Swiss-Prot record:
Residues 1-19, 72-95, 146-155, 221-238, 298-327, 371-387 are cytoplasmic. The gene is mntH. One of its GO terms (molecular function) is symporter activity. This is Divalent metal cation transporter MntH. The keyword Membrane applies. Keywords: Cell inner membrane, Cell membrane, Ion transport, Membrane, Symport, Transmembrane, Transmembrane helix, Transport. The chain crosses the membrane at residues 20-39, 52-71, 96-118, 126-145, 156-175, 197-220, 239-258, 277-297, 328-344, 351-370, 388-406. Signal peptide: none annotated. It comes from the Bacteria. InterPro entries: NRAMP_fam (IPR001046). GO terms for cellular component: plasma membrane. It is a multi-pass membrane protein. H(+)-stimulated, divalent metal cation uptake system. Residues 40-51, 119-125, 176-196, 259-276, 345-350, 407-412 are periplasmic.
Length: 412
């Protein structure tokens, strides 16, 4: 009886520790459902129905592995990816990495910020510029939570992630997708046209986020409690749960667009405003409102995550620190410029996601090299199978990017 009580107590303690260590992956996962995902998934679903769902499935599986590796690097070494690159690579390479990572972070933030502004515009009936001002204010307020530590921020962002997931359960109920065709689209690969390749690259860029690869390793580098193996085990659960939720949201986005737009003849729906306006008569005003609210929630939470990632990148690569409010102010400027110039915000969102796909390999190559180094990682070093899978992902990403560049250059 005593042994049972001891085992029961130790089991509860292990579960309590696992719960305490969960959270970083939810911050990382919010980057996988930002407004860039809304734009690319809606465009892909409206244009090609369920044919590109398989891209979301495979991109999400790749993302799970990548985020586990990133988190593992922080746990095993106590340093994040940017710091490891700084410590192991020549200075010119480090500066190159910092510049491209900042560009990627700004491209990401552009999509997130404009997406939230569009969301405010749709649900409140304000102008895009007024929506941007509201987004800026809301972002500053959310970032103030960081002063209280990482946990309050994890809870708020995790709550927003769950809200977006719940919103898309509602959207699926409204749109009633064809489950047989949906399942087929998830399993059978198809790239019918050059536009499909462009959108597939966009989906990949929107699903696997380079800035979150840098960020996740910093969120786990200061995790304490239990052994390294216990922290790693808890982190794998954290990533599996958070990324499964994010993957479901991405699939639901594309499936809803396919069911609501593609199969009703609205294959040209390509921007968020049009999607909102088209949803009202096709499904209902409630469905359109839920769409707008989920866009605001995704945009606000992901732009906060983008700001944190930018801070990690700067501190890690060049040991330079600026206050978060200064970084937030500077990174808002491109969004306001795009809005004031009257550029098509949804096109900017999709282009930013394609740009992101070029940063994936640059972040992933050193991550694979470091996590495969037994001197750095000790007992958490990558297995042979993980190494091989990681390099296959790099080759696939690079091949898709080359295909995209050649196709764009030749006007295919």
């Amino acid at each position: 009886m005593t042994n049972y009580r001891v085992e029961s107590s130790s089991g509860r303690a292990a579960r309590k520790m696992r719960l305490a260590l969960m959270g970083p992956a939810f911050i990382a996962a919010i980057g996988y459902i930002d407004p860039g995902n809304f734009a690319t998934n809606i465009q892909a679903g409206a244009s090609f129905g369920y044919q590109l769902l398989w891209v979301v499935v495979w991109a999400n599986l790749m993302a799970m592995l990548i985020q586990i590796l990133s988190a593992k690097l922080g746990i095993a070494t106590g340093k994040n990816l940017a710091e490891q690159i700084r410590d192991h690579y020549p200075r010119p390479v480090v500066w190159f990495y910092w510049v491209q990572a900042e560009i990627i972070a700004m491209a990401t933030d552009l999509a997130e910020f404009i997406g939230a502004a569009i969301g405010f515009k749709l649900i409140l009936g304000v102008s895009l510029l007024q929506g941007a001002v509201l987004t800026g204010i809301a972002t500053f307020l959310t970032l103030m939570l960081q002063r209280r530590g990482q946990k309050p921020l994890e809870k708020v962002i995790g709550g927003l992630l769950l809200f977006v997931a719940a919103a898309y359960i509602v959207e699926l109920i409204f749109s009633q997708p064809n489950l047989a065709q949906l399942g087929k689209g998830m399993v059978i690969p198809s790239l019918p046209t050059s536009e499909a390749v462009f959108l597939a690259a966009g989906v990949l860029g929107a699903t696997i986020m380079p800035h979150v690869i840098y960020l996740h390793s910093s969120l786990t580098q200061h995790l304490y409690g239990g052994s390294r193996q216990q922290r790693y085990s808890a982190t794998k659960w954290d990533v599996a749960i958070a990324m499964t939720i994010a993957g479901f949201v991405n699939l639901a986005m594309m499936a809803t667009a396919a069911a609501a737009f593609h199969f009703s003849g609205h294959t040209g729906v390509a921007d968020l405003d049009e999607a909102y306006l088209t949803l009202q008569p096709l499904l209902s005003h409630a469905a359109a409102t839920v769409f707008g609210l989920s866009l605001v929630a995704a945009g606000l939470s992901s732009t906060v995550v983008g700001t944190l990632a930018g801070q990690v990148v700067m501190q890690g690569f060049i040991r330079f620190h600026i206050p978060l409010w200064v970084r937030r102010t500077v990174t808002m400027l491109p969004s306001f410029i795009v809005i004031l110039m009257g550029l098509d915000p949804t096109r900017i969102l999709v282009m930013s996601q394609v740009l992101l796909s070029f940063g994936i390999a640059l972040a992933l190559v050193p991550l694979l090299i470091f996590t495969s180094d037994s001197k750095l990682m000790g007992d958490l070093v990558n297995s042979k199978r993980v190494k091989q899978t990681g390099w296959v992902i790099v080759v696939l990403v690079v091949a898709l990017n080359i295909w995209l560049l050649v196709g764009t250059a030749l006007g295919l």
